[in-house]
Amino acid sequence: MAKRILITDDALFMRVTLKNILTQNGFEVVGEASNGREAVELYEKLKPDVVFMDITMPEMDGLAALKAIRSKDPNAYVVMCTAMGQKQIVLEAIQHGAKDFIVKPFQPERIVEAVQKAA
């Protein structure tokens, strides 16, 4: 069965790019969110297998959304996908339960690899 994925990024271009990579590789994108608040709401409704999460977004940033999702579902598989690759931010994301961290710009293979790691 194809992995069900939620994409969260405030940039439409990035959501479209991720969706194209994922669907071309046989994964199902079940939802898209443009901020962390939407991501938390859609996660509860859609129960995706994997969430791609940007960090810098309006209303609720990706780290706050990661914490909110993981507080409701400790097994949530969240992959941070952001241009912010500073060590402290990576560490904070991992400490709060992110399963992977991808720095933009990325190679499409890296996105596929992150989904394939999800059990």
Which residues does each predicted region cover?
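Active-site beta3 strand of CheY-like receiver
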Residues: 46-52
